C-alpha cells in the first residue's frame, strides 16, 4: 500500500482485498468483552474536520481508540480556522506537535492530496471526504459489507467482488461516495451501473468504468446490491429536478420496487438518508437494508486502514492473539 490513503483509485486489487481481510480480523475485536488492541499505543492521530460529520468522525475516533492511539479531535468551528488560518498554517502547527497521522475531511476537492504532498507535515494522511471528489474509507466499508452479504464472512476471505452487479442510484454529480465506489468496485471486479436523471450526472461520465442508465425499474432485477444516494441540496445552487415528489416517483426505492430485486440482493445507503425521498421507511427498516451494518463495518475498516498505514506489516491476528493471552 501507499503511505497515504487519498483516493480509492490508488488501491490495487491486492491492496483492497488485504484491507478487507484485515478488517475481518479487526471485526473480531468487537465481539470481545474488551474491545481494545495495543497496536497504536504511543501514536497520535488528529481528526481534522473542516466539514460537519457524524458517522465518519465518530467511526474514526472509535477505530483509533480501539487501537489504543492518542486521539485529538479538531473542528474548524471554534478553532483558528474560523479566524482565517490557512490549511498550511494548521498543518505546520500539527507538525510541530509531532502527530503521526491526520484524518482530514475538507470541503475543497484535493485538500487531502495537498496536505499529503506539500511537505507541510510528515504524517500519514487519510482522506475522510474531500468536496465532491473522494471518500475512500466509505467505499471500502461498502465493499466489505457487500462481500460479507453476497459472498460470506469466512468464504469471502481472499476474494474480491468479481461478477457482482452493483447499482448506484441518485445524486451522482455531487457524490464523492459514488466516485469512490465506482473506482473501488471496478478494481474488485464488480459490474457497476449508475442510475440518475441526466441533470445529476457529471460531465465526462462516459469515461468512468461503469454503465449509465436512466430507468431504475429495468436495472433492479439484475442487481445484487442497490445503493441509494441522498440528493445533496447543500451543494446545489440550481434546480436539478422538477419536484421532490417527481424525483421520488422516478428514482426512489419503495417496497414495490424492492420486490423486483433478486431475493439475495441487498439495499445499501451511506447515510444520512432522507426517508420518503430516495428511500421509504419500509425499505430502510427492512432486513435487506444494510445501513446500520455499514456503520458497524466502518469501524472495522478504519481500524484496518489505521493499522496497515501506521501499525506495521505483521498480520493483524498476531496482535489479537497477544491481547488475548
From Swiss-Prot:
Tell me, which GO biological process terms does this entry list? 'de novo' pyrimidine nucleobase biosynthetic process; 'de novo' UMP biosynthetic process; amino acid metabolic process
Q: Give the Gene3D superfamilies listed for this entry.
A: Aspartate/ornithine carbamoyltransferase (3.40.50.1370)
User: Where on the tree of life does the source sit, at the highest rank?
Assistant: Bacteria
According to UniProt, the reaction catalysed is: carbamoyl phosphate + L-aspartate = N-carbamoyl-L-aspartate + phosphate + H(+)
Keywords tagged on the record: Pyrimidine biosynthesis, Transferase
Q: Which GO terms describe its cellular component?
A: cytosol
Its EC number is 2.1.3.2
Pathway, per record: Pyrimidine metabolism; UMP biosynthesis via de novo pathway; (S)-dihydroorotate from bicarbonate: step 2/3
Known function? Catalyzes the condensation of carbamoyl phosphate and aspartate to form carbamoyl aspartate and inorganic phosphate, the committed step in the de novo pyrimidine nucleotide biosynthesis pathway.
Give the record's subunit note.
Heterododecamer (2C3:3R2) of six catalytic PyrB chains organized as two trimers (C3), and six regulatory PyrI chains organized as three dimers (R2).
* Family classification: Belongs to the aspartate/ornithine carbamoyltransferase superfamily. ATCase family.
* Protein name in UniProt: Aspartate carbamoyltransferase catalytic subunit
Amino acid at each position: 500500500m501507499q503511505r497515504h490513503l487519498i483516493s480509492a483509485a490508488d488501491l490495487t486489487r491486492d491492496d483492497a482485498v488485504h484491507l478487507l481481510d484485515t478488517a475481518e480480523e479487526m471485526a473480531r475485536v468487537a465481539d470481545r468483552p474488551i474491545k481494545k488492541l495495543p497496536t497504536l499505543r504511543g501514536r497520535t492521530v488528529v481528526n481534522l474536520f473542516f466539514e460537519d460529520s457524524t458517522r465518519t468522525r465518530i467511526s474514526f475516533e472509535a477505530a483509533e481508540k480501539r487501537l489504543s492511539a492518542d486521539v485529538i479531535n479538531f473542528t474548524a468551528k471554534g478553532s483558528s480556522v474560523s479566524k482565517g488560518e490557512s490549511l498550511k498554517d494548521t498543518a505546520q502547527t500539527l507538525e510541530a506537535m509531532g502527530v503521526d497521522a491526520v484524518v482530514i475531511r475538507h470541503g475543497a476537492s484535493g485538500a487531502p492530496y495537498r496536505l499529503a504532498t506539500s511537505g507541510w507535515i510528515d504524517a500519514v494522511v487519510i482522506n475522510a471526504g474531500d468536496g465532491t471528489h473522494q471518500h475512500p474509507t466509505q467505499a471500502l466499508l461498502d465493499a466489505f459489507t457487500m462481500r460479507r452479504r453476497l459472498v460470506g464472512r469466512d468464504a469471502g476471505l481472499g476474494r474480491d467482488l468479481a461478477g457482482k452487479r452493483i447499482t448506484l442510484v441518485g445524486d451522482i454529480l455531487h457524490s464523492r461516495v459514488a466516485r469512490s465506489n465506482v473506482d473501488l468496485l471496478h478494481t474488485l471486479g464488480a459490474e457497476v451501473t449508475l442510475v440518475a436523471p441526466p441533470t445529476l450526472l457529471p460531465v465526462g461520465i462516459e469515461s468512468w468504468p461503469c454503465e449509465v442508465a436512466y430507468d431504475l425499474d429495468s436495472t433492479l432485477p439484475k442487481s445484487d446490491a442497490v445503493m441509494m444516494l441522498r440528493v445533496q441540496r447543500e451543494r446545489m445552487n440550481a434546480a436539478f429536478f422538477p419536484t421532490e415528489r417527481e424525483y421520488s416517483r422516478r428514482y426512489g426505492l419503495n417496497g414495490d420496487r424492492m420486490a423486483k430485486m433478486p431475493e439475495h440482493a441487498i439495499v445499501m445507503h451511506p447515510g444520512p438518508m432522507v426517508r420518503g425521498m430516495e428511500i421509504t421507511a419500509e425499505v430502510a427498516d427492512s432486513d435487506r437494508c444494510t445501513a446500520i451494518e455499514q456503520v458497524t463495518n466502518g469501524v472495522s475498516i478504519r481500524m484496518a486502514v489505521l493499522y496497515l498505514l501506521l501499525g506495521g506489516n505483521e498480520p493483524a491476528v498476531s496482535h489479537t492473539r497477544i491481547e488475548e493471552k
